[in-house]
């Protein structure tokens, strides 16, 4: 095994196809957002914030365009912290709360995607 690692080190490194992840996220995230809203009898117009995994700005902008929802409803902080993996949504939610951007009764969609091309979404009322 160790000898194989020396001969073929590329097989033992983490790799990511950024273009494939972008295409995946832009296709799956809007679909799962629509699905979670439908299951909760809500429309996009009733949602105050859509908080996505903070992978990169291009994905957030593309999801905003695809859903035809103003980018202002998609808070972002990746410019401050980068991609913090599974912590990105909780960090942004906490930051918004500390900055008093979240108000009682607001409806929020949380949508994540990541390793292994997994994805999911939930709706909460603040």
Regions found by a protein language model. Name each.
Residues 1-78:
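Hydrophobic pocket-lining "lid/loop/helix" segments that shape and contact the acyl-thioester
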Residues 32-33, 89-96:
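Buried hydrophobic packing segments
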Residues 55-66, 87-91, 123-126:
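Short amphipathic alpha-helical segments at helix boundaries and their inter-helical linkers
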Residues 56-58, 82, 115-117:
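Short Gly/Pro-enriched loop/turn and capping motifs at secondary-structure junctions
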Residues 66, 70, 81, 95-99:
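Hydrophobic alpha-helical segments
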Residues 77-89:
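Active-site-adjacent helical/loop segments in soluble small-molecule enzymes
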Residues 93-126:
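Conserved beta-strand-centric core segments of catalytic alpha/beta enzyme folds
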């Amino acid at each position: 095994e160790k000898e194989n690692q020396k001969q073929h080190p590329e097989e033992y490194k983490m790799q990511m196809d950024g273009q494939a992840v972008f295409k995946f996220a832009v296709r799956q995230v809007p679909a799962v957002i629509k699905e979670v809203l439908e299951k909760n009898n809500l429309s996009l117009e009733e949602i105050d914030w859509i908080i996505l995994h903070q992978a990169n700005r291009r994905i957030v902008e593309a999801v905003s365009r695809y859903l035809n929802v103003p980018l202002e409803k998609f808070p972002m902080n990746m410019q401050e912290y980068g991609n913090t993996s599974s912590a990105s949504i909780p960090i942004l939610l906490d930051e918004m709360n500390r900055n008093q951007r979240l108000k009682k009764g607001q409806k929020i969609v949380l949508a994540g995607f990541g390793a292994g091309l997994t994805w999911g979404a939930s709706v909460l009322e603040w």
